[in-house]
Amino acid sequence: MTPEHLPTEQYEAQLAEKVSRLQSMMAPFSDLVPEVFRSPVSHYRMRAEFRLWHDGDDLYHIMFDQQTKSRIRVDTFPAASQLINTLMKAMIAGVRDNHALRHKLFQIDYLTTLSNQAVVSLLYHKKLDEEWREAATALRDALRAQGLNVHLIGRATKTKIELDQDYIDERLPVAGKEMIYRQVENSFTQPNAAMNIQMLEWALEVTKDSKGDLLELYCGNGNFSLALARNFNRVLATEIAKPSVAAAQYNIAANHIDNVQIIRMAAEEFTQAMNGVREFNRLQGIDLKRYQCETIFVDPPRSGLDSETEKMVQAYPRILYISCNPETLCKNLETLSQTHTVSRLALFDQFPYTHHMECGVLLTAR
C-alpha cells in the first residue's frame, strides 16, 4: 500500500487474516467466532495530517514511509474522505503563490464529517500576524465560494487563530435515530465514521434490555455515552480532556438527552472516588451511591486498563470493552476472565490495509 494507492482487491483477504488472528488471540478466553464489521474500501478516513514540502516554486503534501523514513509526495489520498481530497487540491492552489500563507508553513491537518463540514488547520514555524489573518480570511471565502463548508485555523508556538470556530458538527444515523456530535479540532474523534456507526449500533444491540444505569470511563465527546443513553435509566461518564468535556456537554443538549452526567476526571481518580479512597470537589452535588450501575463501558487508550481499574470493573455484572489494541485487551482478560466470561465478540475494521484491529467484547459475570 502507498498513500496514493489502496490495494482494494486485497481487502477480503486482509480482513479474513484479521478475523483469524483475533480468534487465535481470544482462544484462551472464548471460542466465539467474531462478529465482523467491514469498512468501506476507500474514502473511510474523516481526518488526516500531512507535512508540507517546499520544492522551489512547488508545494505539496508529503508523508513518510514508516520503514525507510523516505519522503512520499501525496497529491491524492484515497483512504481519506472525498472532501479531504477536494480540500487538498484547493489548499495547495490557494497557498502555493501566497507568501503570507506559504512562508514557514510545515503541516496541514484536515478534519471532516459525513455531513460535509471541514476544519483545516495550518501549522507554522513563525508568528502569525494581521497579514496572515487577512490572507487566510480571503482563502476561506474563496473556498466557500466553491461550495466548501470549511473553517480555517492557524497554529504556531503558543498561538491559535480561529477565523470562525474550531469545531464541526457530525450527524450520524444510529439505529434509526440521528445523533449530533460536535468534533473539536485537535481533539480525539473516531477516524472512520462508517465504522463508528457500526460500533455504536453493535453496542446498542448488545446492551438492549439492560437494567439499571451505565458507567463509562474515557467518554471523549460522549460518542458512546449519548448513543447508549436510550438503553439505560441513567449514564454517568468520565473524561479528563477539557475540550472533549465541553463538546460532550454540547452534544447532550443538541441531542435533547436528559439522563447523562459527565464528570471531568481521570479514570484512575474516579476509581479512587468510587472506592472511597479520596474525595473530589468535582463530585460535589453528585451522589455516586444513587447510581445503580449494572454495566460499565470502557474504551481505553492503547495501553489498556491499569490494574486498579481492572479491579474496579470486575465489580460490575456486565463489562462492555471496546479495544483499539487486542494485545492489551487480552492482557486485561487474564484478570477479567477470573470473574467474567466473554458473551459477545466483534471485530471492527477501523483501519483497513493495516495490521491494526479494533474489537469489542461483552463480558458477563460468572
Curated annotation (Swiss-Prot):
CDD domains: AdoMet_MTases
Gene Ontology terms describing biological process: tRNA methylation
Keyword Transferase found: yes
Reaction(s) the record says it catalyses: uridine(54) in tRNA + S-adenosyl-L-methionine = 5-methyluridine(54) in tRNA + S-adenosyl-L-homocysteine + H(+); uridine(341) in tmRNA + S-adenosyl-L-methionine = 5-methyluridine(341) in tmRNA + S-adenosyl-L-homocysteine + H(+)
GO terms, molecular function: rRNA binding; tRNA (uracil(54)-C5)-methyltransferase activity, S-adenosyl methionine-dependent; tRNA binding
PROSITE patterns for this protein: SAM_MT_RNA_M5U, TRMA_1, TRMA_2
Keyword annotations: Methyltransferase, S-adenosyl-L-methionine, Transferase, tRNA processing
InterPro entries for the chain: MeTrfase_TrmA_AS, MeTrfase_TrmA_CS, SAM-dependent_MTases_sf, TrmA_MeTrfase, U5_MeTrfase_fam
Active site: 324 (nucleophile), 358 (proton acceptor)
Disulfide links within the chain: none
Enzyme Commission number(s): 2.1.1.-, 2.1.1.35
Residues annotated for S-adenosyl-L-methionine binding in this entry: 190, 218, 223, 239, 299
Pfam families recorded: tRNA_U5-meth_tr (PF05958)
CC terms in the record's Gene Ontology section: cytosol
PANTHER family on file: TRNA/TMRNA (URACIL-C(5))-METHYLTRANSFERASE (PTHR47790), TRNA_TMRNA (URACIL-C(5))-METHYLTRANSFERASE (PTHR47790:SF2)
Family recorded in the similarity comment: Belongs to the class I-like SAM-binding methyltransferase superfamily. RNA M5U methyltransferase family. TrmA subfamily.
Function text: Dual-specificity methyltransferase that catalyzes the formation of 5-methyluridine at position 54 (m5U54) in all tRNAs, and that of position 341 (m5U341) in tmRNA (transfer-mRNA).
Name listed for the protein in its UniProt record: tRNA/tmRNA (uracil-C(5))-methyltransferase
Species this protein is from: Salmonella paratyphi B (strain ATCC BAA-1250 / SPB7)
